């Protein structure tokens, strides 16, 4: 691959918006759909914006494949991605080669507001491919990746990182990323080892430490521990972040971003039948987006997670659906049956009582749990060491207390049952 032209690099730097300029230009978004592998695709971004999201990231895209494989691009990008209904938009890539990263980013720079480098993915595929959080020890390479985009793209470059156990090392890491040219910094408050059943609690205190000790002009996003809409404002206030990013919280309940609708359960805990129908219609309208239809089955399972154990016939049918199924088959075998069941539930004489959402006592982490009927979207409490539900928070606290003390002696803030999905 050839070196980028110097004149092109100079022009890009002259015209490029800095962090605060870009943040203002895209409307100062505060509620962000996280980059999620095979999950934050076009149709899901459109749905999330309808329910309060003000900025969205694409799924993590593999830079080398995107730059070199036409099929990969067609499977993951369409003419609708980055269109007027899909802005503001940040396109995220994983990479370990500056030239391939730049080549990939050049293909989308006219269809997005910024390009993000994934430095947070903790999954085995990232370890095997040598990208994401498995670059955390290679600061020279990370600096080169970011700086190459900073000097040669029309649009700004941003980055999403995880933290180290050591607060000072995390701070120096963040400073390096910013020095390389990142205009937005997203900090996921978990270390690389926190994934799956070891996800545990995101450390808001470490995120706050970074925010407090980085330049004030840094555009700073926090990621981790978002279960309900009020957690967003609580996170922003505690940390001083410009915005909050949600991954799994958004996947199981798009209403998590509806911060101005906290007394409207139809907005913050929407009925699964209505969300399924609305999302299905969006996917049909985005037929140019192969990624949207490919992701639909996975989204259905997440939206319907509390519902399916009560209606195993629908779960069995959904499990058999595949990419060859027609739109009519999806509607007749999945969408309509869900609608029928929920409609029957709402015809019950005591539905007003059954449909109540109760709020528990305030917890040590600052928020309260909700008891939500299974026919409404709601957070997913991922099991930890076989423990499910709210009890896993206490297990997380116990596990933390018996593990080695964090070098910076920073206490954990807030409790969470979600993990960052692949990004």
Swiss-Prot record:
Cofactor: FMN
EC top class named in words: oxidoreductase
InterPro entries tied to this protein: Aldolase_TIM, DUS-like_FMN-bd, tRNA_hU_synthase_CS
MF-aspect GO terms: flavin adenine dinucleotide binding; mRNA dihydrouridine synthase activity; tRNA dihydrouridine synthase activity; tRNA-dihydrouridine16 synthase activity; tRNA-dihydrouridine17 synthase activity
Catalytic reactions of this protein: 5,6-dihydrouridine(16) in tRNA + NADP(+) = uridine(16) in tRNA + NADPH + H(+); 5,6-dihydrouridine(16) in tRNA + NAD(+) = uridine(16) in tRNA + NADH + H(+); 5,6-dihydrouridine(17) in tRNA + NAD(+) = uridine(17) in tRNA + NADH + H(+); 5,6-dihydrouridine(17) in tRNA + NADP(+) = uridine(17) in tRNA + NADPH + H(+)
Cellular-component GO terms for this entry: nucleus
Residues bound to FMN: 35-37, 92, 160, 188, 223-225, 247-248
PROSITE patterns: UPF0034
Region Disordered, annotated ranges: 404-423
UniProt-listed GO biological process terms: mRNA processing; tRNA modification
Residue numbers bearing the N-acetylthreonine modification: 2
Active site (record annotation): 121
EC numbers on record: 1.3.1.88, 1.3.1.-
Similarity remark: Belongs to the Dus family. Dus1 subfamily.
Oligomeric form and interacting partners: Monomer.
Stated name of the protein: tRNA-dihydrouridine(16/17) synthase [NAD(P)(+)]
Annotated source species: Saccharomyces cerevisiae (strain ATCC 204508 / S288c)
């Amino acid at each position: 691959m050839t070196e980028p032209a110097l004149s092109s690099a100079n022009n890009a730097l002259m015209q490029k918006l800095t962090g605060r300029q870009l943040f203002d230009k895209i409307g100062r978004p505060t509620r962000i759909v996280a980059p999620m592998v095979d999950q934050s695709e076009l149709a899901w971004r459109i749905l999330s914006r309808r329910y309060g999201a003000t900025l969205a990231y694409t799924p993590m895209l593999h830079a080398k494949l995107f730059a070199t494989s036409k099929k990969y691009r067609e499977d993951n990008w369409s003419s609708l991605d980055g269109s007027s209904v899909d802005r503001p938009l940040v396109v995220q890539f994983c990479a370990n080669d500056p030239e391939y990263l730049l080549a990939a980013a050049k293909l989308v720079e006219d269809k997005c507001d910024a390009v993000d480098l994934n430095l947070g993915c903790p999954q085995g595929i990232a370890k095997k491919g040598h990208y994401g959080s498995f670059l955390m020890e290679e600061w020279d390479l990370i600096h080169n990746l970011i700086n190459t985009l900073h000097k040669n793209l029309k649009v700004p470059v941003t980055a999403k990182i995880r933290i180290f156990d050591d607060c000072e090392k995390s701070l120096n890491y963040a400073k390096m990323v910013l020095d390389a040219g990142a205009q937005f910094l997203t900090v996921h408050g978990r270390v690389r080892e926190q994934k799956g059943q070891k996800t545990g609690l995101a450390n808001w205190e470490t995120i706050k430490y970074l925010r407090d000790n980085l330049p004030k002009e840094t555009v700073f996003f926090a990621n981790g521990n978002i279960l309900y809409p009020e957690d967003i404002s609580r996170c922003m206030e505690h940390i001083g972040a410009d915005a909050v990013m949600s991954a799994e919280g958004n996947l199981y309940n798009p209403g998590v971003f509806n911060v101005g609708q906290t007394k409207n359960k139809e907005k913050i805990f929407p009925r699964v039948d209505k969300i399924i129908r609305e999302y299905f219609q969006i996917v049909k309208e985005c037929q140019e987006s192969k990624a949207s239809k490919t992701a639909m089955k996975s989204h259905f399972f997440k939206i319907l997670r509390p519902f399916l154990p009560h209606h195993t016939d629908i779960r069995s049918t959904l499990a058999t659906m595949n990419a060859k199924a027609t739109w009519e088959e999806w509607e007749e075998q999945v969408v309509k049956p869900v609608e029928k069941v929920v409609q029957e539930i709402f015809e019950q004489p005591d539905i007003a009582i059954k449909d109540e959402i109760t709020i528990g006592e305030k917890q040590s982490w600052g928020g309260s749990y909700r008891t939500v009927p299974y026919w409404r979207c709601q957070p997913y409490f991922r099991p930890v060491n076989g423990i499910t539900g709210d009890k896993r928070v206490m297990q997380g606290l116990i596990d933390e207390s018996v593990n080695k003390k964090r070098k910076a002696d920073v206490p954990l803030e807030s409790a969470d049952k979600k993990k960052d999905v692949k990004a």
